[in-house]
Amino acid sequence: YEIGVRLVGSEMCIRDRVKIDNAAPFKISFNSPSDSIVTLATALNDTVHTVTIMNAIEAFHRQPEFKGFLLDKGKNLVSPPNLPQRKIEFIGNSITCGYGIESVEASDPFTEETENHYYTYAAITARNLHAQHFAIARSGIGIYRNYNGPREGSPDCMPAMYYQTLFNDSSEIWDFSRYIPDVVCINLGTNDTSTPGYDTDSLYNAYLAFHKTVRNNYPKAKIVWLTGCMLHGESLSLVKNTLDRLSDTLHKAGDLEVYRFDMTPQTGELGYGASWHPSLCLLYTSPSPR
């Protein structure tokens, strides 16, 4: 989630990424079983400030709740700035989450401390295009087979979970009319093909079925299918060829708002994040468009 607010005052209290006015963003952490008050800033000039809060980690094991702001006595929120008109939805896996992006060692394990969605290709792209962005992502998830999953597929792959508001709660179904993107970017397939045992026909059929789901939700959106920067060799060729086939099939069927984009495979030249994931430095370079 991302929350933006404007307020009058000098002090405010609320693991999130915080940006105040034009200052560099910073991360705050809190871990409490009960409601917590976290101070975001003190000693600000007593004037209007713009504050943005972004959930920096994936909410697979946690259910973040924002209860509100505490302001100086007698101070209040003011009318917020208009949101950007452009809207993008990103659907993906750990690369989209920002898994290990602040780590400096490929051998590091996953920790919430080094995950940061703010520095992912998704968030950076949205900021550069002055767009709102909505991310639906979970580490290890696939289009039909999660990381090292069975050949026949995983019951909790992205198409099965896509309808849920929260990954860990199947009771609340998301209302897709609440956010209608102009562009949907889908980066799935890395986990499906990262280990042996995948089925190529199941991979293609899952891509096709999920595309129809997304198209049904957003009839006018441009849908962009991506290959991620962690794919290499046989897996990269397979996913590229499968997505090219998907795009061709959909174009011939009359869906002309389908596009392809391949990220440049990472080489280690710019370092790695945890578990060989992209580093913050790598994600500031430009992928190669097709």
Please provide the spans of the model-predicted regions.
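Exposed low-complexity, polar/acidic, P/S/T/G-rich flexible segments that act as propeptides
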Residues: 56-87
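Short strand-turn-strand beta-turns centered on an Asx-Gly dipeptide
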Residues: 19-23
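Conserved small/polar residues in nucleotide/adenosyl-binding loops
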Residues: 1-3, 7-16, 284-289
